[in-house]
């Protein structure tokens, strides 16, 4: 398993332990990708997982740029069109600065 897949697996376990149900992983469409898709009660949660091994370029949080947010929104729109409904939704981030389940930061509404 590569580091990205390991980070996504850690994030999925972390979110599940906080009550979210993972309903999709690595959803891809032309122009975008969503790492994890989850449900928290009736809210669809699109999760970007970011892993950084050091803070040389600002850490995991700084790596979510405006361009990355646009790609997430594009992929989410595609996903919603595919499922044919518009539930309440939000965009979260799971930030890991190492492959350490004790050091995961969950940011809602990025």
Predicted regions and their residues:
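Short acidic/glycine-enriched loop/turn segments that link adjacent beta-strands
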Residues: 30-32, 100
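Aromatic- and charge-enriched substrate-recognition/interaction segments
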Residues: 67
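Conserved catalytic cores of phosphodiester-cleaving nucleases, focusing on short active-site segments
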Residues: 34-60, 64, 72
